[in-house]
Amino acid sequence: MTKLFIPYIMGDKDLIENATLLSENGADIIEIGVPFSDPVADGPVIMEAGQQAIKQGITIDYIFEQLEKHGNQIKCQYVLMTYYNIICHYGEQAFFEKCRDTGVYGLIIPDLPFELSQRLKQQFSHYGVKIISLVAMTTDDKRIKEIVSHAEGFIYTVTMNATTGQNGAFHPELKRKIESIKAIANVPVVAGFGIRTPQHVADIKEVADGIVIGSEIVKRFKSNTREEIIKYLQSIQQTLNN
């Protein structure tokens, strides 16, 4: 099975240009961050990118507008990573309707409790927008079974400080956890935690069905040339599916 490459970008003024570049250079699904004033789940790089986007005047309305006008330029699926407050403020039904109309494949909502995610799935499943399940490495087995049994799209396994030493190897316990999730899952199980280098990718791809790269992609769009970004994406893609 081909491994999924899921890069993350901040929804900002360069959203369509950046997403198009990613989709033309190996991305299977693109995660688009919706800037929010209190992003509790974001690291410093993504938090700073979100603050810059807010200063640019970026809102969820702007992101929807861009996807509506130019989403056909993005040659792969895309999901929104957003906090529930934004959905609530927009209006749940209106939000799901807009996601459907702008081609959004799914939603990653890091501050959404499992029970609330189930209500949203039941209420708005007819819009065809997946709610992606997040599983932390600290989640107990009983809860994991519950989450996995209701998962759709893909499962996003998240942890912090998962690498051991400087060689980019991930902790054996982390790999065992991913394998145990895969054993009971009916959708791909992807890993997204501090993955930056081809070495990280080579190590974690042995167990995960795909990878999410966030902060490193955001940093490179900020400081690298287009050619350097493409070279990096190609190195990740080659390592992932070698």
From Swiss-Prot:
CDD domains: Tryptophan_synthase_alpha (cd04724). Coiled coil: none annotated. Gene3D superfamilies: Aldolase class I. Pfam families: Trp_syntA. One of its GO terms (cellular component) is cytosol. Keywords: Amino-acid biosynthesis, Aromatic amino acid biosynthesis, Lyase, Tryptophan biosynthesis. The keyword Amino-acid biosynthesis applies. The keyword Kinase does not apply. It is an enzyme of class 4 (lyase). The active site is at 31 (proton acceptor), 42 (proton acceptor). Tetramer of two alpha and two beta chains. The alpha subunit is responsible for the aldol cleavage of indoleglycerol phosphate to indole and glyceraldehyde 3-phosphate. Belongs to the TrpA family. This is Tryptophan synthase alpha chain. It comes from Staphylococcus aureus (strain bovine RF122 / ET3-1).
